[in-house]
Amino acid sequence: HYYYGSDMYVNEAEIVSGIPSSYPGYDLTIGSSGEPVITIQEQLNRIAQNYPAIPTVTVDGIYGSATAESVRAFQSIFNLPVSGIVDFPTWYKISQIYVGVSKIGENIR
C-alpha cells in the first residue's frame, strides 16, 4: 500500500531563508531588556533604511517608548495589529522583512 503513491521522494535543501534569531518565547514590551531586544532594535534600524516611516532607535537592549513607537510604525506598515508589543507574529514579520532588505539569504549555497 502506498499512501502517497509510488512516485513519492524526499528532497532536501541546505538552507532555507528564515528567522535570523529565534523568537524568545515571550512578548517584548516596555520594560523588556536583553539580547532579544537588541536583535529587534538592530533589525528595525536596518529595515528603516528601506522604510523611512519607521523611526530608528538607540540599540541599547532596553525596550522603551522609542522602541515601542518603532514597532508600532512597523506593525502599521505591514498590516499587523498595532500594539507596540513584539509578539510572535510581529517577531516573525520583522525577521522576514529583515532577511529581505538585508539580502542575507542571497549568497547561501
Question: What are the residue ranges of the model-derived segments?
Answer:
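Residue-level signal for alpha-helical context at structural boundaries
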Residues: 88-89, 108
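Phosphopantetheinylated carrier protein domains
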Residues: 76-78
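Extracytoplasmic/secreted envelope proteins and their assembly/folding machinery
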Residues: 37-41, 68, 91, 95
